[in-house]
Amino acid sequence: MKIKKIISIFTSFVIFSFCSSSPEASIDIFEAAKTGNVEEINLHIEGGSDLNERAELNSDTPLIFATIYGQNEVVKLLSQQEGVNLDSQNIQGFTALCVATIWGQIEIIETLLAAGADKNIKCFGDENNSGPRVATALMGAQASVNPGIEKQYIDSAEQYGLELDLDKIIEGRAKAAEALQK
């Protein structure tokens, strides 16, 4: 009788464990952020993945990665999660908001600001506290990109495998300057 009870409890435990487990993500969180795979990001969230994990490349977080690749739906999802650090900086001193500002990604800027990202945070890792507002004042409203900055865009695009559209970036930065002054 005792053995039947133990077997019954064990069987119930196994069945409950199997039924209650959620499927695991099939790709890493950075690839999911890069490709805009909201379903996989949700699996990472449900599975308890570290949403502030650092990538080998520049110590980017999944939020910064999603921003770099223009994945606003992933940015929205991650920015709504408890514990996600909206103002986390990579080794270059960039936050997700800094990245969105530099690349002129107005929708992502609006998403991050609505979620509470700090638009006055120190950016670029310099001593002059060049936050996104300063970044847009220096770069955002320019009608063109100077050769030094253009080279930085080219280098970053190559590093991350991005297509580079300087006209779109310039247009977006002008809008970013307006959004960050509100």
Regions found by a protein language model. Give the residues of each.
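Conserved ankyrin/ankyrin-like repeat signature
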Residues: 40, 73-74, 107-108, 149, ...
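Ankyrin-repeat-protein effector appendages
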Residues: 19-28, 132-182
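Ankyrin repeat domain, specifically the short helix-to-loop turn at the C-terminus of the second helix
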Residues: 43-50, 76-85, 110-118, 156, ...
